[in-house]
A protein has these predicted regions:
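Interfacial transmembrane-helix starts/ends
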Residues: 16-17, 21-50, 66-69, 104-115, ...
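Membrane-interface helix-loop junctions in multi-pass transport and translocation proteins
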Residues: 66, 101-160, 198-222, 243
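Membrane-proximal transmembrane or re-entrant/amphipathic helices at the cytosolic face
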Residues: 167, 173, 177-181, 197-254
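Hydrophobic transmembrane alpha-helices of multi-pass small-molecule transporters
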Residues: 4-7, 44, 80, 122, ...
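Membrane-interface junctions at transmembrane-helix termini in multi-pass inner-membrane proteins
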Residues: 74-123, 165-171
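Alpha-helical transmembrane segments of polytopic membrane transporters and translocases
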Residues: 1-9, 35-38, 70-77
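Helix-loop junctions and terminal segments of transmembrane helices
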Residues: 2-26, 30-33, 86-95
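Interfacial segments at transmembrane-helix termini and the short loops linking adjacent helices
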Residues: 47-80, 95-96, 100-106, 137-148
Length: 254
C-alpha cells in the first residue's frame, strides 16, 4: 500500500536506535539522515507521479482521488521522519539507565517530551478532524471532499511535530542535516518528476485493458527510477560509493 511504499524508506534507520543505546559514536547519524532523505524523497516522488495512472489501473473511477493520494504521500514521508527522529532522541536519553533518577529528571528528559508532543499532536488531529467532519456533514459535503479534508488535516497536523523534533535533533546531534546533499536529492527528484510527467501526458494511453496498460506504465516507472539513480549517482560521491557496495554484496551472494 501507499504507507508501506514510503515507510520502506525508513527501514535503513532501524539500526539507529540500538547503536545510540549502546552509546557508540554518533558520527554515523548525519549520513543516516541523508540516506533517509535520499530514499524518502525518491519514494514519495514516485507515489505522487504515478498516483493518477496507479488509481486508473485499479479502477478508472478512482482517479478523482489523486489529490488525496498526493497528500497522503507527503504525510507518509513526514511520519517516517517523525519516527526516525523519535527513535533517535529516545535512543540517546540515559535517564532510564541512572538508578537514582527522579520523577523530575524524567519530566525533563526526551522520553517524556517526545512522547508527550506526539500525544498532543494526535489529540489535536482528532479534535480538528471530528469538529470539521461534523460541520461538513451537516452541509451535505460529498464523500470525496470529506476524504480530502481528512487527508489535509492528517498532513497539516504532522508539520508542527516534524519541526519540533527537527529542532530537538539539531540540538542534540549538532545539526545532522546535510543541506547540500538533501538539495541535490530534491533537485534530482524535481527533474525526474517534471520529465516523467511530461512523458506521461504525451505518450501514456489510458486503456481499460489492464494487460496493455500496466506494461506501458511499467516502462515509465523504470524510466523514473533510472533517471533518479543516474542523476544522484553523477552528483553525489557517497551515493556512488553506496552503489559500489551494493554491487559488491550482490556479486558476493552470487
Amino acid at each position: 500500500g501507499l504507507e508501506s511504499t514510503i515507510a520502506a524508506a525508513g527501514l535503513m534507520s532501524r539500526a539507529v536506535y540500538p547503536k545510540l543505546l549502546e552509546n557508540k559514536d554518533i558520527s554515523f547519524f548525519k549520513d543516516n539522515i541523508s540516506y533517509l532523505f535520499y530514499f524518502g524523497i525518491f519514494s514519495t516522488s514516485l507515489v505522487i507521479i504515478f498516483a493518477n495512472p496507479g488509481l486508473f489501473a485499479l479502477n478508472p473511477s478512482f482517479v478523482i482521488a489523486t489529490p488525496i493520494v498526493v497528500l497522503l504521500a507527503i504525510e507518509g514521508f513526514l511520519v517516517v521522519l517523525i519516527n526516525v527522529f523519535q527513535q533517535s532522541l529516545t535512543g540517546i536519553e540515559k535517564v532510564d539507565t541512572i538508578d537514582n533518577s527522579t520523577a523530575k529528571d524524567y519530566l525533563k528528559s526526551n522520553l517524556f517530551h517526545v512522547h508527550t508532543m506526539r500525544l498532543i499532536q494526535t489529540v489535536v488531529y482528532v479534535v480538528i478532524l471530528v469538529i470539521g467532519l461534523i460541520l461538513l456533514i451537516s452541509v451535505n459535503t460529498s464523500e470525496i471532499d470529506l476524504l480530502m479534508y481528512w487527508a489535509s488535516v492528517l498532513l497539516i497536523t504532522q508539520i508542527p511535530l516534524v519541526i519540533y523534533l527537527s529542532l530537538k535533533v539539531t540540538k542534540h546531534f549538532k545539526f545532522p542535516f546535510d543541506i547540500k546533499r538533501i538539495l541535490v536529492f530534491l533537485i534530482a527528484s524535481i527533474v525526474m518528476s517534471i520529465s516523467t510527467t511530461l512523458l506521461l501526458d504525451r505518450f501514456l494511453i489510458y486503456s481499460e485493458n489492464i494487460y496493455y496498460f500496466l506494461p506501458n506504465l511499467l516502462i515509465f516507472i523504470m524510466f523514473s527510477v533510472g533517471m533518479y539513480l543516474m542523476l544522484t549517482y553523477v552528483a553525489d560521491s557517497k551515493i556512488r560509493q553506496l552503489f559500489k557496495l551494493i554491487v559488491q554484496e550482490i556479486i558476493k551472494k552470487t
